[in-house]
Amino acid sequence: MGVCADLGSHRWCRALSTQHNTEKSKEQQQQSQPLEIPEQRASKCRGDIDRTTTTTIPASKTLTASPAKTAAFTVKTTRRRRSRRRAEGSSICVPIRRGQGSTPTPTIQVLQFVLVSLLALLAKNAQAHNIPEDAVHITAILGEGVIFNCHVEFPNDHPVPYVLQWDKKVSETGSDLPIYIWYESYPEHIEEGYKGRVSRVSQDSPFGSASLNLTNIRESDQGWYECKVVFLNRDPKQHKNGTWFHLDVHAPPRFSVTPEDIIYVNLGDSIILNCQADGTPTPEILWYKDANPVDPSPTVGIFNDGTELRISTIRHEDIGEYTCIARNGEGQVSHTARVIIAGGAVIMVPPTNQTKLEGEKVIFSCEAKAMPGNVTVRWYREGSPVREVAALETRVTIRKDGSLIINPIKPDDSGQYLCEVTNGIGDPQSASAYLSVEYPAKVTFTPTVQYLPFRLAGVVQCYIKSSPQLQYVTWTKDKRLLEPYQMKDIVVMANGSLLFTRVNEEHQGQYACTPYNAQGTAGASGVMDVLVRKPPAFTVEPETLYQRKVGDSVEMHCDALEAEGTERPTIKWQRQEGEQLTESQRNRIKISGGNITIENLRREDFGYYQCVVSNEVATLMAVTQLVIEGTQPHAPYNITGKATESSITLQWLPGYSGGSEYKQDYTIWFREAGVNDWQTISVTPSGSTQVTINGLASGTTYEFQVVGRNVLGDGMMSKVMTVRTLEDAPAAPRNVKAATQPPDSFFQLMPDEAGPKPGPPRNVSVTEVSNGFLITWQSPLERAHIVKFYTIKYRTDAQWKTLNRGQIRPEETQYLVKNLVGGRTYYFRVLANSEKSYESSDEVKFPVPARVKHKAITAGVVGGILFFIVAIILSVCAVKICNKRKRRKQEKEFNMVACRITDARNIAANNHHLHNRSTGSISSGQVPLKNNTEHYRDYESVFIVPGHPVIIKIVQTNPNIKSNRHSHCHLHWIWPPDRCTNCHSIYSSPNLEDGDEDDGGGGRRRSVSRIQRSLDGRFVLDVEGVSKLGYSQQTLESGNVDVVDGGLFERRNSNVSQKSSSDDGGFLSRRNFITARASWRRPLVASSSQLSLQSAADSARGFLQGLLKIGAKQSAVPPNSQSYFDEAVSGARYQNVLRPYTSSNNLYGNADRSRPLHINTISGSLSQQQQLYTPSRISRIFSSSPQQLQPHHQQLLLSSGGSGAYPTHFSDLSTVYPPNSAERSSHNLSSRYRYYSQELPSLRTIQEETRRQQQQKQHPLEDHFVPLQLPSPPSWRSYYQSQASYRPRTRWYPRHHSRLFSNRQQQHEMLSPLPQLNLNLRNSMNPGGLEASPESRSSSSGFGSKNTSNHPGSTSEWRLLPPYRAPPSPPKHSGYFGGQQAQGQTPHGSYSYPRATTPPYTMAHWLEMISRLNAATDSNLPKAPCPVDVGSVDGHYEFDPATPTPSASSMLREDLNLHIDTHPYHHHTLGPLSGSLLHSHAPYGGGARKQRSLPAHLPRYDNVEVRLQAMREEFYAYRKRQAMQQMESVC
């Protein structure tokens, strides 16, 4: 008999061994096997049975049942490899024979049987206990899914048909329940309870082909599972694949038993709260009360593994919400139960303090619970039901939950609101909150009139109501802002009123106040008239002290008188500090007017009394003291106490003792607070005011009173004083637990039993408001009465910090924070602190949003823009100032070396750049002028020969015209006929005769030697030469003829307009009612110069010589005339030497008397000449030293003739010697003025000796020659056509015109059309243009013609001139000479007056010359006196010395004669200027030489003081204009 065990299939099989029929067969079988030792055979059998191998299989992968659910499980597999014996039969253990033919003994058989039985039992136990050890353990969550991974191992790796079966072990007996069976091509078998939850995994999944998917796991699914794979058509003994799995199902906790949601209890009852939960693993039970863990105490405990919470003897602090929490590794659940006291309502959510704006809605909550739940809620405001408050009746609402709503709120709604709840059982419960209504500050009342007492302190009231509190008040007085903070005698009070410390009359006025608070203002008050009046005055004042005995009477007197204009004051008596008289006193008091009488005095009558006098102006007060003697002592006062642990020291001030003869002692009354019995202690020594009471308990509050006593008895008791003794020094702490605090902990280590803790603050929140962040919370529900203060902790990192600096009172439940940093996250906690403990609220997280300070950015941007604008403005101003200073410096240097170039320079400089008249362009005339030669294309070519004098040439271009019918029209360039009242005689001229020499054109030409210079630089014509012109000496003496610059003109009743359109300064000199400015304003004409000058030296002599030739008869030229002319110009200093005339005739040799006089101009009326030499500055004339004149140049100059000379600058004269032009070129010294100023300054002080030498060379015949100093001469312009189209007169240049043009293009655009002007003299007629009027340049003494400041290009003002207003035209006269004019005859040399074609005629030059020549003492004096220098206002303003100063007091000079020497043998003198006629010394045509003597020494100036005064006034006016200009330029 044998037993075999198939360990590979884990099945035990029993084989029954058969006995051979014959002994022979047994013996043969034994013989066929080798002999073995019994022990070895037994060992081999046991080894086959017990040989096992244990192998650890790697953990399987985590499987997922579905995408939505994941089964996380742990695989713990121990696979034991068993040794399998592959044999046809079972392994048989046979008895061992010891010898051949011997049989086993009974003992051996018994041993074998026992051994086999034991092995069978062990194998059976091994089968039962090996399954769990080899299983794969999987953990899954309840309700989720799991996959059992099972692989199929085919025999020899060849797929064969198989059956898949999954079994679940349902009992310890080993019975299996097939839950899933699968065979290919057959329907699946699923056990009941697993349908819809089990399935075979897909073949393309990463799991084994035999894997099973189990979903929606239940707790019953926990257990053992086996995967079986049975291969068909195989030997049953073939091994089978299979795996064991153990499934553990975990479940989150869930309650199986919970307490009721609301539990009603009575105080003193006991309750048990039961809370049980199921789950895998077993959950843990925790208890919380109002979000805080329940602390075990003698009355509160947790039992039965935390499932029960027992509360015995319920108190008020035990009422609240209790929460049971069950938790395990899979989650947690909670349940809350409310414990409410039955029988009375309890407020669960009390109201909180609120602050609202006016007009908003406010809600006060008041939630209450009670048993039974019929809770009634009532609301009160300041003790009155809100339903009964009339102001709230229509705006208040009470909800069912007890909340109070007020909508909208008003300022008067501020106050305390109380919520009271009750259900009829017990006392009502109440809670209160305060409502603060904020609104802008406003004025509630505005008195019409307020009075201030004169010379006393007074107050101007502003009745203000404000919430929040008032911040400031602004005041206005008489509609102007009042700054009381800047005044010493005005103080702004806390309520916004004005306190005047000493009133004066200046404080009277109309006042208004405007209050402001955090919400702004509601507006200003009305206007209050504040009147200053005298206050009432005391006429009788009470005495300072009244002493009376008990029972006596006292009479106190008081009276006052009102001030004038005020009401009579009222007088009343009162006790000190405004206390009214007591009832007992009123029966004993008599008041008569201002007198008061108190009878039957008592001790209580002792004290201070006030006499109050008041009216509408002021309230005055007089104080007196009434002392009652013979009474008990009065009560001590000002009691103070100092406490220790066991003693208190008291101090006080004694009261009135009852009289000086009474001595008082003191007794201390004290008791412990809350105790009814008082104890007394006498104070020793007698009269002491300090005592120490010992033997008191520590930490106890005591009450004290002090009473005085004298011989009359005990006095009055003092006020009660409360003092608390100090606590004993604390002993060393015991039972202190040492703990390591985390770095973020803000809690302090406290010993055990530190005292009761208050409940934690609730509902902590952080909200952002307009002015910061508001942290709010609610007071604790438990032990809120022990809260002493709150503390707020915060952190942004690990360290907790205290937010509030001081303690927050327990009634406050909010805190405003203003300095939180944007972009950070803050954590807050609120601590409720008691005396010895505290409790913390939950941590609140608040991220502060990152804020951009838009206002700061805007302010920065605006500030930056403003900064750049200011910088630009300052830079421009600095550049302008620097440029202006630089120009002034340059001009100052320029004026140091250059004479003031006036008329001729401006003429030449301006005409140099002129195009022909048709283009209408002009030159700016700036200094220096630009080089431009193209403008001379209309001129004849000239030679520029440096170092030679320049010949002045005045050409008569049309000598063939002999008719003088229109010849007088050409004199209109002197003065326009419509500018004077009676100018007809001005434009009439006699037939001037000159037989000195022939001009080559059939006419006669006078010698230059007839012209001499007077003391002031004017030219004088010899009278003898005048007589040859057809005027008699009587005519000249009678004043009917004017001799002006070599021309004689008859005038009759001329009334020249004295008006000038210029307003920029200057002075006028009056001569015989003919008014001329110091620098004469030319008539308002807009024509170019009519005179072209070809010299920079004393070229005016040629001009005068030309004037003498006007109208002269043609005659032979005297042999000495050219020499005179040469002498006149030989000493001249020049710069540009022009090409000689192409004609070899003399200067006026080609002039025809019958044709109009042709005057060279720059405007282009002459034929164009080829220009042989053009320097870099062709239009400049440099002042340079004369150099040797080449002979051929001199020959060319002397033989020049014709009419194409290159135009030169008449004003480029200077006595200063700059470097020679042959040596180097210097800066142009041309005048910087657009219009000349008619006068050249006298420069005799410079190079006087050189000038004298030049004059000697120029006058070899000893004739006196005054240096050239005359107004700018007139000039003519030749026109292309003889008839002129008259153009309107316009003033087309401002006073600073020259600076406005910097190039030719601008000049062409700015040019105005010039009027065509005609010039008719006696025997010539030539259409010519008129020189531009110098409207903006008078004398340099005028403030508008500043020497150095008004440089071209500077920022001087642009003064637009008024339009020209033409005066009435002069009347025509019927006759010019005696009866000839009356008879309608035109004498020889007279003018017809064609009004339609009469151009303007600049007579300003002639009138000014006459006025200046009259100031000279004698034209024949050998040496002219030096000009008087009036001086200058400052370094920039100079005055022409040759200009007399007019004044209202200055008499017109009528005794001055105009004496002109035109020839050594002919002298012409103009008599005194009287009336409108000029008188001649010789009759017309007379040849006798007759000279009128002049006074020897006449003053150069009429009235210097008046002139200086006028100069000062105009200087001040100029300074004012200059300041205005600078201000405008800066702005």
UniProtKB/Swiss-Prot annotation:
It is a single-pass membrane protein. Disulfide bonds join C150-C227, C275-C324, C366-C419, C462-C513, C558-C611. The keyword Transmembrane helix applies. Residues 1333-1349 have a biased composition (Low complexity). Residues 19-44, 1248-1269, 1318-1395 are annotated as: Disordered. Keywords: Disulfide bond, Immunoglobulin domain, Membrane, Neurogenesis, Repeat, Transmembrane, Transmembrane helix. This is Protein turtle. It comes from Drosophila melanogaster. The gene is tutl.
